[in-house]
C-alpha cells in the first residue's frame, strides 16, 4: 500500500457523494466565498470539511480549537458535528471576515462557536493561562 493516497478528482467525488449533505448555510458560505476572488483559496475544500466532520463524529470529540477561520465554513462544518454539549473556539485576527462568519453562524442557529478576534499567539497564551484543553485542534491560519 502506498504511503500517501493522492486525492484525485474521482476520490474527492466519492468522498463528497458518500458524506453528509451540506446545509443551506454551508452552501451560502461557499457561494459567498466565490465572490471574494483570489481570497477564496483561504477556504478548505468540501471534502476536507467532510473529513473533519467524520473525524469529530467518530472520535467522541467535544472541544475543538480552530486557528484561522476565514468566513466560517470549517468552523460551522465542525460545530455541526459536535454533540449538544460540544464547543468550538475559533481564533482569527481579521475583523471583517470574523463578522461575516458570525452572521453565518447566527443564520445556522449555531451557538457552539465562540470567536476570539485577535492574533492567534495572544489568544493561545490566554487559553493556555486559562488551562483550556481541546480534543481536536485544527490549524488553518496564515502560514
Language model region names:
Residues 1-136, 143:
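A short alpha-helical cap/connector motif
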Amino acid at each position: 500500500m502506498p504511503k500517501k493516497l493522492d486525492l484525485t478528482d474521482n476520490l474527492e467525488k466519492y468522498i463528497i457523494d458518500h458524506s453528509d449533505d451540506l446545509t443551506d448555510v454551508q452552501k451560502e458560505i461557499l457561494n459567498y466565498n466565490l465572490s471574494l476572488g483570489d481570497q477564496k483559496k483561504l477556504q478548505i475544500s468540501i471534502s476536507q470539511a467532510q473529513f473533519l466532520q467524520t473525524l469529530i463524529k467518530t472520535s467522541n470529540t467535544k472541544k475543538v480549537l480552530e486557528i484561522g477561520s476565514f468566513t466560517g465554513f470549517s468552523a460551522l462544518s465542525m460545530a455541526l458535528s459536535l454533540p449538544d454539549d460540544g464547543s468550538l473556539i475559533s481564533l482569527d485576527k481579521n475583523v471583517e471576515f470574523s463578522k461575516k462568519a458570525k452572521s453565518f453562524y447566527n443564520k445556522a442557529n449555531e451557538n457552539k462557536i465562540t470567536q476570539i478576534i485577535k492574533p492567534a499567539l495572544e489568544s493561545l497564551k490566554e487559553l493556555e493561562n486559562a488551562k483550556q484543553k481541546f480534543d481536536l485542534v485544527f490549524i488553518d491560519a496564515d502560514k
